[in-house]
Amino acid sequence: MTLRLWHHLKLRLSPEKATSVYELVDRPLVPVLSQMECLGIKVDRTVLARLSSEFAAQMELLEKEIHGLAGQPFTIGSPQQLGEILFGKMGYKGGKKGKSGQYSTDVTVLEDLAGQGIDIARKVLDWRQLAKLKSTYTDSLQQQIDPKTGRVHTSYSLVGAQTGRLSSTDPNLQNIPIRTENGRQIRDAFVAEPGNVILSADYSQIELRLAAHFADVEPLRDAFEKGEDIHARTALELFGEVNRDTRGRAKTINFSILYGISRWGLSKRLESTADEAQALIDAYFQRFPGISNYIQETMATVRECGHSTTLFGRKTWFPRITSPNQAERQGSERAAINAPIQGTSADIIKRAMVQMGPALKAAGLGHVKMLLQVHDELVFELPEADVAAASDVIRAIMAGAAEPLVKLTVPLGIEIGTGPSWGAAH
């Protein structure tokens, strides 16, 4: 069956202008991924067990506090009981019942309540986060350690994400949370063998760099060329000054714009009014008109052709871009704006992965092992004595991975860290 499909699909590669993506990116990546899956990464079971106990203790404390605020015990993990407590007994506004007759208590609802200063909602969000970390990671990962190797061996898929990004399963190592201290601690359980260290190499702000390339935004290109803090530069352009607050707001705006955020969405992230958020969006587009032009041109192309295209020729299709259903259409529009950027980023790191093994071997570093790929990051294991030499090779390959197929107008920055664990390497 696979061979029959290959004969059929091969005929479509050239007309779809996808030959280079297949021949130079995806096909040569298959043996690389196979080797990474076989290697796996060592996991320290004692770290996971300790974190599981700590999370359980934190959950127990939160449970007591939540029950105290509610005035009665109830099952926090039950959406039905939580909804009745919040909107029935406690009488908070904003409760909406679905077709099942139950109040919605999803993350959006709880974040809205927490944003109003409602303490119980914030504590439930914290409890849920801990429950997720405990069940999905600290407990589940212990069951997925191979008893023969002491390592976990994730499975990668080239077709798991629409934009060309890799996905992983059993376990999914792409979604380990890094925004919270508890989430970051989970990476401490991924460790090197005795005598080795973990090396993390991460593309720095690659999507913003690619946006500057796609949109031909000179101030942003100039900032990246000079190695400036891009969020500080945006803060200066929008607010006229740089401090912790303006830089934080500028960072939120930088990333939000690339995902086609609405003024309502941005107002929630900035905790501002919708009018204030719209004023910032307008100011951003006025200061960086190339971004606005890129968004408009991308939308026009996708509406006309039904797809977007990366710099390498990979197409992402959006069949619902003209849907009469507003929610479906707007969702496709937001995804279409970012797809060329995210897809190009995925193609670049795949190119780096294909070139990495031969380059390390040529430098006498064939024993350096590439273990994981997580979005814009590559994770290696190597002897500590080889860190300096390996870092030079890894940085060079990642920085030049787009060439000669694509000539970027912005440099690709690479951040490298090392340590006894994945967490310590950050």
Q: How should each PLM-predicted stretch be described?
A:
Residues 191-194, 363-366, 371-375, 392, ...:
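A structural signal for short secondary-structure junctions
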Residues 390-398:
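Short amphipathic alpha-helices in soluble, non-transmembrane regions
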Residues 400-413:
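Flexible helix-coil linker/hinge segments at domain or subdomain boundaries
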Residues 198-200, 207-241, 315, 319-329:
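Metal-dependent catalytic core segments for phosphate chemistry
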Residues 87, 210-212, 424-426:
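Short conserved micro-motifs at the rims of enzyme active sites and ligand-binding pockets
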Residues 38, 146-149, 153-154, 158-161, ...:
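Conserved catalytic core of nucleic-acid polymerases
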Residues 76-77, 201, 223-225, 341:
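Conserved, non-catalytic sequence blocks in retroelement Pol enzymes and Pol-derived host proteins
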Residues 1-179, 184, 195-197, 204-207, ...:
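Conserved "right-hand" nucleotidyltransferase catalytic core of DNA-directed polymerases
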